[in-house]
């Protein structure tokens, strides 16, 4: 069993066979037509360094025009802040998100790296490991 823990707002899986954990908005927000906004989920994930977490669109929302802008968003094991979801409204109207709405899915996957690793720790913030 892989040790994955959550702090803050704990995401849930819909069924025992669901690959993704549902991430929820922590605030009411309006996303204007054509705009992209960052929404804090209040969720902090702690997981082993051989995994990364992918923030993926919810299929039902994507079908209606709301999707994760950088899908999949990649979260490294050394990211130490709450998860933010960058949502893009592809519709011609404003999109209302209410606190508690499911806005994305979080899926954990193993990965392989090769060669030299240049740094031991992260120096950048959201979306950055530096330069």
List the predicted regions and their residue ranges:
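DUTPase catalytic domain/fold
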Residues: 1-131
